[in-house]
From Swiss-Prot:
This is 2,3-bisphosphoglycerate-dependent phosphoglycerate mutase. The gene is gpmA. Pathway: Carbohydrate degradation; glycolysis; pyruvate from D-glyceraldehyde 3-phosphate: step 3/5. It comes from the Bacteria. Catalyzes the interconversion of 2-phosphoglycerate and 3-phosphoglycerate. Belongs to the phosphoglycerate mutase family. BPG-dependent PGAM subfamily. Its EC number is 5.4.2.11. The record marks H182 as: Transition state stabilizer. It is an enzyme of class 5 (isomerase). Keywords: Gluconeogenesis, Glycolysis, Isomerase. It catalyses: (2R)-2-phosphoglycerate = (2R)-3-phosphoglycerate.
Length: 247
C-alpha cells in the first residue's frame, strides 16, 4: 500500500479578504503560517515522513510546504516546483471580492464561476496588468500555456500530466510523497483519483492547511482517504470554503 499526502496552502491574504486569487502570487497570513506549522506538527506526531515534496510556483503553497517541513525537521528534502500545480486561473475575477460579485451577479452565477466543472470565468485580456504572461517564472512556457482564465476541466488537463509524469512514478518507485498545492489543483487530483463525476465535484471543498491522506493500492487506486486530526474541524473548515462565494 502507498500513501499520498495532499495539503492545501494555509490561509492567504486574499483568502482573508475573500478575493478570487488564482495565479496572483499573494502571501500567507499569520493564521496561514500557523496552519502550515500545525500540519507539520500533526504529520510528525502521526509518524509520517517523506522522501520527496512537490509544490506550485506560488509563494502561498511554497511557504506552506516550508513551514510544514520545518516542523518535521525535513527542510532538506528535495522539492520540485511546477506551474502545473498552480491554482486554477480565475481570469477577470482575480482580485475581486467573492461576496461583492455574488451581490452583483447572484450566488448561483458565482457558484458556477467558482465550482462548475466546465464553465470558466470571463477571461483576462492578454495586455491586462493582472496577466502572468510576462512573469519571469513562466518564461520557459509558450504564452498559450499561461492561461487567461480556466475552468476546473482546464485545471485537470493541466495537472494530470504532472501526476502521470512525475508524482505517480515517484510513488510507485517507493518514494513517500507530500504535495502542497491549492484548492482547485488538489480538487483536480481528487476528481481523478476518486473518479468523481463532473457534477459531483462541484460539492467538493478542500480546507486550508489540513493534511489529506490517500491510501492507494498497487495501481494507485484509492483504498480510502481521510483528513488528519479532528474530522469535525476539517468538515467545518470545508463548509466555510463552500460559503465564501455567497452574498
Amino acid at each position: 500500500m502507498y500513501k499520498l499526502v495532499l495539503i492545501r496552502h494555509g490561509e492567504s491574504t486574499w483568502n482573508l479578504e475573500n478575493r478570487f486569487t488564482g495565479w496572483t502570487d499573494v502571501d500567507l497570513t499569520a493564521t496561514g503560517v500557523e496552519q502550515a506549522k500545525n500540519a507539520g506538527r500533526l504529520l510528525k506526531a502521526e509518524g509520517y515522513d517523506f522522501d520527496l515534496a512537490y509544490t506550485s510556483v506560488l509563494k502561498r503553497a511554497t511557504r506552506t510546504l516550508w513551514h510544514t517541513l520545518d516542523e518535521m525537521d525535513r527542510t532538506w528534502l528535495p522539492v520540485q516546483h511546477s506551474w502545473r500545480l498552480n491554482e486554477r486561473h480565475y481570469g477577470g475575477l482575480q482580485g475581486l471580492n467573492k461576496a461583492d460579485m455574488a451581490k452583483q451577479y447572484g450566488d448561483a452565477q458565482v457558484l458556477v464561476w467558482r465550482r462548475s466543472y466546465d464553465t470558466p470565468p470571463p477571461a483576462l485580456e492578454p495586455q491586462d496588468p493582472r496577466s502572468e504572461r510576462s512573469d519571469v517564472r513562466y518564461a520557459q512556457l509558450d504564452p498559450s500555456q499561461v492561461p487567461l482564465t480556466e475552468c476546473l476541466k482546464d485545471t485537470v488537463a493541466r495537472v494530470l500530466p504532472f501526476w502521470n509524469e512525475s508524482i505517480a512514478p515517484a510513488i510507485l518507485s517507493g518514494k513517500r510523497v507530500v504535495v502542497a498545492a491549492h484548492g482547485n489543483s488538489i480538487r483536480a487530483l481528487i476528481k481523478y483519483l476518486d473518479g468523481i463525476s463532473d457534477d459531483a465535484i462541484v460539492g467538493v471543498n478542500v480546507p486550508n492547511g489540513i493534511p489529506l491522506v490517500y491510501e492507494l493500492d498497487a495501481n494507485l487506486k484509492p483504498i480510502r482517504h481521510y483528513y488528519l486530526g479532528d474530522a469535525e474541524a476539517a468538515a467545518k473548515a470545508a463548509a466555510a470554503v463552500a460559503a465564501q462565494g455567497k452574498a
